[in-house]
């Protein structure tokens, strides 16, 4: 069996209940058909911040062949605090509303029809802006053979060499059962023409194992805001002559540096960042991802002179990053608006301590190959940074970023409105790159 990715947005039903509704109470409820992505709050403007528990239901038919491998359910975003049930049994949960996640549901399935139920607990207030509620980004059904390339398992880093040309390093995570494998890497230029292939053969011991390869490019076309040239790396995984998996990753050749005297340098040249902060909602359309509406927003930004986007104040949809790659928009990708100290009663502070690393891992691993991303922002206006414990959290988040982007495809940063505070300055000194929110009066003093 060869790996398949199937967009899984159709065929869902929805039911809105009170918080704490039991599974046993669901059959008698009124269900109606919905198409994902879905935001249940936007339909009634008098209840845009209403507490409620949304349930999503879908049937999943499975064959014996599919169950011989692994069956994964991937969610690009569910707002928030969701729990998945498969055939009445809890199969996994995820708390943060903006980070992508995946559940391996194989062991809960049987041949024939299976029932999927996703509970989404939305308690207000939980944010400082309109969040929406529900499965507001894409869902993907992933069918995998005995050995396959892990989700977000390809890591690409390109760097210019002193003697000329560029070297690209590729790390591929293989998951599953032991096998003798063959991996073929093929690169395509921005016009779609093949630039050649590179192969490796190895024995995969099973579990998780990373395989590395590298290749050189003499004179690649660089990615920039005016000319966003994108290359494609195709990785094919074989066992003997059988194709197990195939992944296409876009990437770009570019350097991104921050210098205290010269500012931001893209490909060695100073670029003034004309940026805006963009929340994830689409105005009257709500929070449900609509790629055409999102592309329209970004085109308007580009036309008004914007060259940089800050994803305020959370991980963006996968499509936003892809569009910014294609349109030549730089991205400050932000993860959190709060850490352990709350800004609203039911926000992510409830889950941060336990789940911060898995959220950072999801965030970084999904998007680390995108040339548009130049910064990883670990937080916005974080209240914790004025206390000594906030320094410990800063160091921990910084280490997570380096753990999942060790080659430094983008730079860690933080947006702070406490830069006059000594402890906040210590936090900023950890990441070395800080946003001075409402602190223009400190620019000259701190630069000196």
Give the role of each language-model region:
Residues 5-19, 34, 46-47, 51-152, ...:
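Accessory beta-strand-rich segments of carbohydrate-active enzymes
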Residues 98-106, 124, 129, 205, ...:
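Active-site mouth of glycoside hydrolases
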Residues 103-107, 212-228:
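Signal that preferentially marks extracellular ectodomain short beta-strand elements
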Residues 121-127, 238-244, 268:
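Short acidic/polar inter-strand loop motif in beta-rich domains
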């Amino acid at each position: 069996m060869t790996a398949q990715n199937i967009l899984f947005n159709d065929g869902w039903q929805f039911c809105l209940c009170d918080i704490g509704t039991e599974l046993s109470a669901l059959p008698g409820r009124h269900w109606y058909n919905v198409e994902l992505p879905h935001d249940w709050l936007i339909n009634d403007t008098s209840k845009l911040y209403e507490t409620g528990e949304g349930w999503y239901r879908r049937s999943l038919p499975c064959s014996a062949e599919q169950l011989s491998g692994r069956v994964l359910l991937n969610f690009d975003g569910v707002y928030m605090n969701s729990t998945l049930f498969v055939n009445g049994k809890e199969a996994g949960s995820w708390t943060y509303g903006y980070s992508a996640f995946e559940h391996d549901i194989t062991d809960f399935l049987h041949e024939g029809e299976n029932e999927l139920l996703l509970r989404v607990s939305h308690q207000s207030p939980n944010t400082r802006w309109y969040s929406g509620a529900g499965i507001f980004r894409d869902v993907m059904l992933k069918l995998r053979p005995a050995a396959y390339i892990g989700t977000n398992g390809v890591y690409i880093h390109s760097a210019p060499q002193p003697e000329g040309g560029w070297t690209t390093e590729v790390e591929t995570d293989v998951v599953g059962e032991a096998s003798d494998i063959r991996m073929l890497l093929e690169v395509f230029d921005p016009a779609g023409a093949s630039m050649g292939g590179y192969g490796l053969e190895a024995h995969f011991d099973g579990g998780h194992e990373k395989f590395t390869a590298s290749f050189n490019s003499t004179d690649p076309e660089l990615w920039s805001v005016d000319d966003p040239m994108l290359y494609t790396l195709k990785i094919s995984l074989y066992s003997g002559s059988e194709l197990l998996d195939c992944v296409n990753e876009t990437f770009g050749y570019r350097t991104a540096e921050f210098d205290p005297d010269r500012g931001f340098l893209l490909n060695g040249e100073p670029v003034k960042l004309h940026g805006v902060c963009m929340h994830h909602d689409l105005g009257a359309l709500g929070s449900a991802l609509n790629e055409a509406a999102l592309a329209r927003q970004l085109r308007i930004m580009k036309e008004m002179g914007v060259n940089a986007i800050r994803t305020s104040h959370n991980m963006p949809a996968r499509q936003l990053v892809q569009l910014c790659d294609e349109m030549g928009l730089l991205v400050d990708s932000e993860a959190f608006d709060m850490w352990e100290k709350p800004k609203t009663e039911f926000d992510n502070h409830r889950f941060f301590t336990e789940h911060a690393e898995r959220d950072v891992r999801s965030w970084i691993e999904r998007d680390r190959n995108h040339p548009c991303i130049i910064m990883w922002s670990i937080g916005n206006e974080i209240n914790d940074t004025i206390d000594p414990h906030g320094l410990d959290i800063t160091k921990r988040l910084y280490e997570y970023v380096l753990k999942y982007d060790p080659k430094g495809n983008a730079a860690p940063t933080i947006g702070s409105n406490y830069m006059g505070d000594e402890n906040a300055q210590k936090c900023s000194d950890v990441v070395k790159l800080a946003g001075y929110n409402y602190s223009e009066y400190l620019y000259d003093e701190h630069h000196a």
